[in-house]
């Protein structure tokens, strides 16, 4: 399975002047945790890191340091995530038919999740890793008043990996660019063009590091995993 990792995270919310994926998390950069999990997954045979030119030297040095068994390629990203993934799709090895897209900021994804997602692509053409929503969700109007309360039993929180056939995702990206569609994840592109996307069970701990609080929570989860592994 081919894996693309968009890795152009901003450090703005951290008050940092560098990519948040290069910030330290329990002794190594945030990105390192996602790379190591993908490397340990039995199904992942190639990894493409999609980043910005200013981060290339640091990220390539990180890959060298980790000494991963899985081949890793660097791919230059675009101005927005959507353009970056499109660049990544066009840079896949010749003959690639299926692809997983995984945000580098979701550094707690496990090898088991990557393998489960890879297996899902053998039975469905497109999916999103997701977990059921636990909180009650409120739809709010512009003036701050509650407009609606959706039925929680039908709501899922989308994560990554998200999986697709390369042909269908490339086609949707090209159509999206022509129509100037702006989406927040790749599954939304397929949805916009009427293509079915299924749900694959994600992981409750598969959070996205966006704020300093997320980084602190991620550290606690990793420490718990290390403790559990040590006493097993």
Curated annotation (Swiss-Prot):
Gene3D superfamilies: Spore Coat Polysaccharide Biosynthesis Protein SpsA, Chain A. InterPro entries: IspD (IPR001228), IspD/TarI (IPR034683), IspD/TarI_cytidylyltransf_bact (IPR050088), ISPD_synthase_CS (IPR018294), Nucleotide-diphossugar_trans (IPR029044). Its EC number is 2.7.7.60. One of its GO terms (biological process) is isopentenyl diphosphate biosynthetic process, methylerythritol 4-phosphate pathway. It catalyses: 2-C-methyl-D-erythritol 4-phosphate + CTP + H(+) = 4-CDP-2-C-methyl-D-erythritol + diphosphate. It is an enzyme of class 2 (transferase). Catalyzes the formation of 4-diphosphocytidyl-2-C-methyl-D-erythritol from CTP and 2-C-methyl-D-erythritol 4-phosphate (MEP). PANTHER family: 2-C-METHYL-D-ERYTHRITOL 4-PHOSPHATE CYTIDYLYLTRANSFERASE, CHLOROPLASTIC (PTHR32125:SF4). This is 2-C-methyl-D-erythritol 4-phosphate cytidylyltransferase. It comes from Synechococcus sp. (strain ATCC 27144 / PCC 6301 / SAUG 1402/1).
């Amino acid at each position: 399975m081919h894996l693309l990792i968009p890795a152009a995270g901003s450090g703005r919310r951290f008050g940092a002047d560098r990519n948040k994926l290069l910030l330290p998390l329990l002794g190594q950069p945030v990105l390192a945790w996602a790379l190591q999990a993908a490397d340990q997954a039995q199904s992942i045979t190639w990894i493409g890191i999609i980043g910005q030119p200013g981060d290339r030297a640091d990220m390539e040095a990180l890959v060298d340091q980790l000494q991963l068994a899985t081949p890793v390629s660097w791919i230059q990203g675009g101005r927005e995530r959507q353009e970056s993934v499109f660049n990544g799709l066009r840079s896949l090895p010749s003959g690639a038919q299926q692809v997983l897209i995984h945000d580098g900021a979701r550094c707690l994804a496990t090898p088991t999740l990557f393998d489960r997602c890879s297996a899902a692509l053998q039975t469905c053409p497109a999916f999103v890793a997701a977990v059921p929503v636990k909180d009650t969700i409120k739809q709010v109007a512009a003036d701050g008043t509650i407009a609606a309360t959706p039925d929680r039993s039908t709501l899922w929180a989308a994560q990554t990996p998200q999986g697709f056939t390369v042909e269908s995702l490339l086609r949707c990206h090209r159509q999206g660019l022509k129509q100037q569609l702006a989406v927040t994840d790749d599954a939304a592109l397929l949805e916009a063009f009427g293509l079915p996307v299924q749900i694959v069970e994600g992981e409750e701990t598969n959070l996205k590091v966006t704020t300093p609080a997320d980084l602190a929570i991620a550290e606690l989860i990793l420490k718990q995993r290390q403790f559990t592994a040590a006493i097993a």
